[in-house]
Amino acid sequence: LPERDIRRVYAETVGKFQSDAMLYCEEHWLDKGPPPTVDARGMSDGTLRFLAILTALLTRPQYSLLVIEEVDNGLHPSRAKLLLDMLKTVGAARGVDVLVTTHNPALLDAMGTQMVPFITVANRDPATGHSVLTLLEDIAQLPKLLAQGPIGRLSSQGLIEKSIANEQRADTTRWVL
């Protein structure tokens, strides 16, 4: 998203038959004169994706579920908190539950510890190859891990996955004994 405010987003029909639409936004860059207008071809992939997610969130039926794969794909890391705040605020106001996936450490860091109860880690069971989902708050070593740094950094360093693997090995050993 641009560093300055987007003042207005709108679409107009275009083309020979007026059957296509073009997205436009007005950005507040100058203190004088009309704001510059940028069409979709001049917007970054991250801006377009952010606007698409916001549109989906605003148009979902109330009390529904919105699932977004790689929610931050194409988005500048500095905008991670803005994206999270929007998803939480607009989702709560509209009664829309939001389920997202990410591999982005910046987004995980922006979640902070207050989101721990809502974070699930997916990894593979080495014995079966199946995906295993683990609630972050169910990791026994989580307090020690969080003392070492934010969630994104822990994930980047492989510490969360390593802790889960250690717990899985310990569970397997208990079953064998």
Predicted regions and their residues:
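Phosphate-coordinating catalytic segments in nucleotide- and nucleic-acid-processing enzymes
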Residues: 1-50, 54-61, 148-177
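Alpha-helical structural signal
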Residues: 44-47, 80, 104
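A broad, low-specificity signal for short, low-complexity segments enriched in glycine/proline
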Residues: 59-60, 80-84
